[in-house]
Every structure is written in structure tokens, then in C-alpha cells.
């Protein structure tokens, strides 16, 4: 049995982490049997990174390597692709990593409002002590280093210039993928492939997170077909997950709970009215009982018993 260690669920997603989502989605598309173990207070990773896959004593890291491992085990979501579609898939994934991922990393890990109010609290609460004081800050620094290494070259010298450029590129990338998807359900044919897994993994946290700085998120939400794409994958492949409940499912639960509460209140009111009617009924008036006086120290004994409880 293959075991995948990944960051846990929230925001209606099976994982809040883009690369973990890529692996989870591809595994569902390919039908790979996985035991999913969220990072918790017993977390230990050989290289300190997630996602990582363990199978027969062999550890595999990084989404691309994990997906290749699945393919070697005959779990291949790309078997329907032609040679041209396969090469297009590689080009599109490279475009996502070059043009979209830096802005996603910046949104969650570098932007001060989102990092302090959303990202750091979430990851710190899901990381074992004392690593929870160190790991979120390290992940933030790693994200910034990754952005600067890939995009901080001349003529972009200052961080503000880099930020402006990566968000411009990300919006253009989102527009391109929106146009490429069009009205289709998936990017290639009627079944999802690795490209769908990467697009879903990178977009879903941006789409679903409760961000404070929503610049890129607002642009994504204006591209309704990409939002529907994420919603469809969640409902088609993750609806039965115990890890989380979709927004629509939560609304249904809340509505049923409200109806049940109203029904219970109605029944309680009815019972109270019946009880009042019974009290007012002549044949059910309680008989006046004579006052019983305690014998000896019984009263004091009873009081002591009550106090002892």
C-alpha cells in the first residue's frame, strides 16, 4: 500500500498545499490506491518536505517524481494522450511553474497580510512543537528565495518591480488557461490528465482560501470557467472525503440542522402546551399533601449528602 504524507485539509479542499493537491488529484484521476496521512503532531519526514510517498520502504519526493512513480506502477492518467498532447502537457506545466506559481507563492508566503493572518497561523497549528516556531518562517524565506532566483534577474532589481511583474505574468497565465479550457470540462478530452492535476493544484487554494489580500484571487474569480473547473474536480473526485466538506455540502448540513432545530422547538412548545392543559384540568389537579416532618437528624443528614455530591 502506498502512503502519501501531505499537508491537511481546510477551506473545502483535501489539502491546502498546491503540490500536495497535485499529487492527490492525479492519484484520484489514475485510480492509484493511497493511504493519505496528513501532517500532524507526530510528523517526521526523511527530508523535511511534503508531499512524500512511501511504498515498500522507498521514499519519493516532489510531485513530478511521485507522478512518475505512479506511472511505473501502472497508474497512468495520461495514457489517453497523443505524443503531441504529451509534449503540450509538459509545456503547459512548465508555463504554470514559471508564470503562475511565483505569484501564488507570493500571495500566501510573502504578502504580509496573508502570511500573518492566514498562512503562518494555519501551518504553525499543523506542525509539531517546537518546529511550529521555525518551519513557517523557513517556508516563507524559501518561497521568497525561489521567486527572486527565478524572477529577480535584470532588468527587475527591486522587490516591488519583481512583485509587479509576477502578478502581471500570473494574470496573463490565468487568462491563457481560461481561453485554452473554454467550455470543456478538462484540458484534453473527456478525462482528466496530469495537466488538470497541476492546474487544479495551483488554482484551488487561491480560489478557496480566505485571503486578506485578494488581488490575484479576484482576477481568478472573474474567470468563471476555471472556478467551475475546480468545483467540478472537487465534487467529482473528493466529495466523499472524510477530511473535509464542500461548501455546498456544508450549506445542506446547516439547512438540515436548522430544520431539525425548528422541529424540536415546535415539539417542545407543543409538549409545554399539553402540560399546561393537563395542569389546568380539574380531574388532574394534584392533591394537597400533608407536610412531613423529618425524624431526628434525617434533614441534616440529607443536606450533608447533597453537599457531598
From Swiss-Prot:
| CDD domains to which the protein is assigned, alphabetical | GST_C_Metaxin1_3, GST_N_Metaxin1_like
Output one GO BP term.
Answer: protein transport
User: Residue ranges under compositional bias (Polar residues)?
Assistant: 280-290, 300-309
Q: Which UniProt keywords apply?
A: Membrane, Mitochondrion, Mitochondrion outer membrane, Protein transport, Transport
Q: Is Protein transport included in the keywords of this UniProt record?
A: yes
Under Pfam families, the record lists: GST_C_6, Tom37
Is Membrane given among the entry's keywords?
yes
Subcellular location per UniProt equals: Mitochondrion; Mitochondrion outer membrane
Quick one: where's region Disordered? 274-309
The Gene Ontology CC terms held by the record are: cytoplasm; SAM complex
Assembly state and interactors? Part of a large protein complex spanning both mitochondrial membranes termed the mitochondrial intermembrane space bridging (MIB) complex.
Q: Which family does it belong to?
A: Belongs to the metaxin family.
Task of the protein: Could function in transport of proteins into the mitochondrion.
This chain belongs to which protein, by name? Metaxin-3
What species is given as this protein's source?
Xenopus laevis (African clawed frog)
